[in-house]
Amino acid sequence: MTAFTSRGVFALLYARGPLTTEEGSAGSIRWLPQRAVYALREKIAAIWPDGDTAAFVTAELTGDRGGMAEEDAAVMTQAGVAHLFAVSGLHCAFLVSLLGLLLPVRRRALGAGLSMAVLLFYMVMVGLRPSVVRACIMQIFLLAAPLLRRESDGLTSLSAALLVILLADPFAAAGVSLQLSFAATLGLVCFSQRLSGFFKGLYRGEKRPVRAVVSFVAANLSASLAAMVFTIPLTACYFNTFSLMAPLSNLLILPAAGWSFMLAFVATLAGFLWLPAARVLGWGVWALVRYVLWMASALTHLPGHALYFSNRYLKYWLVYAYALFTACAITGERRRKYAVAAALASMTLLLTVGLNVRLSRYGDMNAMAVDVGQGQCTLLYAGDQAVVVDCGSSNSYVDDGSRAADQLESMG
């Protein structure tokens, strides 16, 4: 299985002669979702002349990051909030919440039916990616459960979503997006409630404002940490990185991103009715997008904001940390053991990072060969100065520049 087969692509064809065009079925209702997403992109560009904001909103609403500046995309990834652009449960929850605000239907069945129809159309419109298919199916289960007088079960709906996806395309199991989406959701289902209860239990006072703040922080932190439980090994394997700032980033950025998503959706829909009104709403979206990018950039300037598995000792630390917390989970109920485990994991992490920095510098000048898949890449470094000689091949599936940058970051 490859990345192509996971997306249902089993053959690559190359044109050798001149291209010819023929009349097709562009006007067919079959292509309505594609025409809708095209119209959405055109309207976004008309509402926000600022290219950076338009690209951010397009990525947020449709998952298409092709227009984003490389710097903005890299900042969001390093801050641990790139999942905002992977259309998933977060977007579906925002969309259902927005529908509840815009369409205050008294009848629960009618409201649930409208929400399901919109979710299915949105799912097809953004391209039937595994993450959005999983999210929409789980959201439909959640909406349908009260109507059928049943309780919604997270593991059941998650399993049903996986079954539907694999029945349609068994090769999708090799897709990175499917693995990350289901791993994050499994962590949320298994651990989010427990972690939230633990954090809320740290404050035993009765002051409502303080309790509201504690509940808000607990909900965000528990969701971030729970989603990371099973995704950290995958991000280490596929992206060679581990964002230490992800919980803090989600706490500071996610609320603003949620409001920007809903306001951008309303502004874009308003743009089809009256463009000046949409541009007025667009100023609010612009401010929220500026805040998100500024905050993400500020967090990535903090020392140690991310760790790179170019540090060969970091993978051993990761195994140690998982073994440590697994041992805590299968032993007694005392909470103090988790504090001890966190302290031990933090101390050994500092030792791991420091050891790699120390051992990567043997003298006044050093040379290192970096594995970039195909071709060669050599680092020459002395003190705080470094030079990259060659940087692999453009035919490699590895992002050569990112791999070299990760190696330099891991050496301090």
Q: Predicted segment positions?
A:
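Flexible glycine-rich surface loops and low-complexity tracts that mediate binding to linear polymers
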Residues: 1
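Aromatic-rich juxtamembrane segments at the membrane interface
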Residues: 5-138, 143, 229
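Divalent metal-coordination and catalytic microenvironments
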Residues: 60, 88, 127, 177, ...
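Hydrophobic, aromatic-rich transmembrane alpha-helices
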Residues: 95-102, 268, 323-331
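Membrane-helix interface "capping/anchor" motifs
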Residues: 103-112, 146-156, 332-337
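Internal transmembrane alpha-helical bundles of multi-pass membrane proteins
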Residues: 128-322
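Glycine- and aromatic-enriched alpha-helical transmembrane segments of multi-pass membrane proteins
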Residues: 214, 218, 303-366
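Conserved beta-strand hairpin/beta-sheet module of binuclear metal-dependent hydrolase folds
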Residues: 262-265, 361-411
